[in-house]
């Protein structure tokens, strides 16, 4: 059957919500059942999980280009449907200088890169509700890594290869072109069978992204449909694509492909056997060099923590790695990148002066119940961080350009007397002795505490006395330093705590009422340096709707 005939039976393109192409079929998902009184014998109409689907056998006359034409029409409609959700809703928890979504759910940062004089950053977005479904990509640009401007909804889940979500990936700046690589996610049938393909898109002269379709259609041997989040790098004279993967034995591994032209890819092998049973899935890989060392960043899922307070299976890790002359990868020692409550899926980019800068998702895959959901949005990205490799350790520092948002410094005496900062966006720097407790974002009922447990040499972050609705409430970090040096970045409903000059970081969402702006120190009296943080440019298409 011709595609035009199927569209006519479906009630026209405006009645089509998705297009699927499973196993020699063309399936059109519909808003409403078709009005045709009788369908031809070779046409199937069924309700799949509440969605009407019109299916026919795909004939030789139906090309990928014809399917792409339908995908473009769906994409244009999807972009129009997001317009009411591009107006940022006012909310006391909304950050002043972090990136947050105007409405809906934000998750992984994607495509973080410098290209032709500008920094580009994308993020995963479901615009309509605070749920993980049918992901879009939002495109932001910046000249200074501080002030980000909304560009567009770059990619939508409109095509047969990404109908249920434009999943995470990275960007490549090659010659004059900006390429995006991502995982296309589709779900088929009543059992929602997952189908995964690695896809590409390229920016045109108008700044719009044109999908090139799947560049890897089939799974490598020994891997489930859980293979995603392409990172593309150029080493040893060829392109390499790194993918987080799950083996048939349900072990996380790194899958690597190579290519000469970014379009035709060949599978190399799976890496990571030296780590043994290190989680049931790896996702969101990144790879970079720092001070002459190679590093692999990923999100292992299913690693149990020895600490009873840590119950979340979604972890973050960075491993020192090597790649030999044959391109084979070995993973050496590894560490957590962040030891707070809310940090996942980081990506890095290199600045024009050679710094390696990281941005992560300040959230976790299973968290969808934050207080900001009452105002129609959830999650934000982390502050950008500079990475340093020094004396066998990774150090993280707040991006130096963020200092342009700081006020003049104020000296603050921290004691058991509560000082009202009258603001929740600030930068506090202090060195504390063991045996004291710092309270932040405090009023008579709520606060978050940092306890320096002298007996056990533990730094304990406790958010149980906040408005948090979901997730762990205690994190503990073992330290051996004689004192604890802290730099704390706060932004309305988040804390990023840089410990001992960035040797450790704890990133967390902290929800307390708008009037909870007190700070106090119990068990010691110490001078601190305080800076108030000014707002950055709002990263939204439309002004905040109060």
Swiss-Prot record:
Reactions accelerated catalytically: Hydrolysis of terminal non-reducing beta-D-fructofuranoside residues in beta-D-fructofuranosides
Gene3D superfamilies: Exo-inulinase, domain 1, Glycosyl hydrolase domain, family 43
EC annotation from Swiss-Prot or TrEMBL: 3.2.1.26
EC top class named in words: hydrolase
Molecular-function GO terms, alphabetical: beta-fructofuranosidase activity
Gene Ontology CC entries for this record: cytoplasm
Record key words, sorted: Cytoplasm, Glycosidase, Hydrolase
Positions of the catalytic residues: 108
Location of this chain's protein in the cell: Cytoplasm
Domain of life: Bacteria
NCBIfam families according to UniProt: scrB_fam
Family that this chain belongs to: Belongs to the glycosyl hydrolase 32 family.
Stated name of the protein: Probable sucrose-6-phosphate hydrolase
Naturally occurring in which organism (per UniProt): Vibrio cholerae
């Amino acid at each position: 059957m011709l595609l035009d005939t199927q569209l006519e039976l479906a009630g026209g393109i405006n009645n089509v919500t998705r297009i699927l192409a499973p196993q020699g079929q063309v399936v059109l998902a519909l808003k409403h059942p078709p009005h045709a009184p009788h369908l031809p014998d070779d046409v199937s109409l069924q309700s799949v999980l509440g969605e009407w689907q019109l299916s026919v056998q795909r004939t030789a006359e139906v090309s990928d280009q014809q399917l792409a034409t339908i995908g473009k029409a769906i994409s244009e409609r999807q972009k129009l449907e997001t317009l009411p959700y591009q107006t940022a809703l006012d909310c006391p928890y909304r950050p002043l200088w972090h990136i947050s979504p105007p409405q809906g759910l934000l998750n992984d940062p994607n495509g973080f890169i410098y290209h032709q004089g500008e920094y580009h950053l994308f993020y995963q977005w479901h615009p309509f509700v605070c749920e993980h479904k049918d992901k879009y990509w939002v495109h932001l640009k910046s000249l200074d890594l501080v002030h980000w401007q909304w560009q567009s909804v770059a990619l939508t889940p409109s095509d047969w290869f990404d109908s249920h979500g434009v999943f995470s990936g990275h960007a490549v700046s090659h010659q004059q072109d900006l390429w995006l690589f991502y995982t296309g996610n589709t779900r088929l049938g009543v059992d929602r069978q997952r189908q995964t393909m690695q896809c590409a898109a390229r920016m045109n002269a108008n700044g719009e992204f044109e999908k090139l379709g799947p560049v890897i259609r089939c799974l490598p041997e020994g891997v489930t449909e859980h293979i995603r989040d392409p990172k593309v790098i150029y080493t040893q004279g060829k392109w390499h694509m790194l993918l987080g993967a799950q083996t048939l034995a349900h072990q996380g591994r790194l899958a690597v492909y190579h290519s000469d032209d970014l379009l035709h890819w060949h599978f190399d092998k799976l890496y990571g056997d030296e780590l043994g049973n290190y989680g049931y899935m790896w996702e969101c890989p990144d790879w970079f060099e720092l001070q002459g060392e190679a590093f692999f960043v990923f999100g292992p899922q299913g690693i149990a923590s020895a600490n009873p307070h840590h119950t979340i299976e979604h972890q973050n890790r960075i491993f020192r790695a090597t790649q030999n002359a044959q391109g084979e990868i070995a993973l050496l020692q590894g560490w957590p990148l962040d030891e707070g409550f809310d940090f996942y899926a980081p990506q890095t980019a290199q600045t024009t002066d050679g710094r390696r800068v990281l941005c992560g998702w300040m959230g976790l895959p299973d968290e969808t119940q934050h207080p900001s959901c009452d105002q129609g949005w959830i999650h934000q990205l982390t502050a950008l961080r500079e990475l340093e490799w020094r004396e066998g350790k990774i150090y993280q520092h707040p991006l130096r350009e963020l200092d342009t948002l700081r006020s003049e410094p104020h000296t603050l005496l921290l004691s058991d007397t509560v000082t009202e900062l009258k603001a929740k966006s600030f930068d506090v720097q202090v060195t504390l002795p063991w045996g004291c407790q710092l309270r932040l974002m405090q009023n008579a009922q709520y606060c978050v505490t940092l306890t320096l447990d002298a007996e056990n040499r533990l730094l304990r972050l406790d958010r149980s006395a906040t408005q948090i609705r979901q997730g762990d409430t205690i994190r503990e970090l073992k330290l051996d330093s004689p004192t604890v040096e802290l730099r704390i970045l706060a932004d309305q409903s988040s804390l990023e705590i840089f410990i001992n000059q960035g040797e450790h970081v704890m990133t967390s969402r902290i929800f307390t009422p708008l009037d909870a702006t007190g700070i106090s120190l119990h068990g010691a009296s110490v001078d601190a340096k305080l800076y108030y943080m000014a707002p950055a440019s709002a990263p939204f298409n439309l002004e905040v709707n109060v």
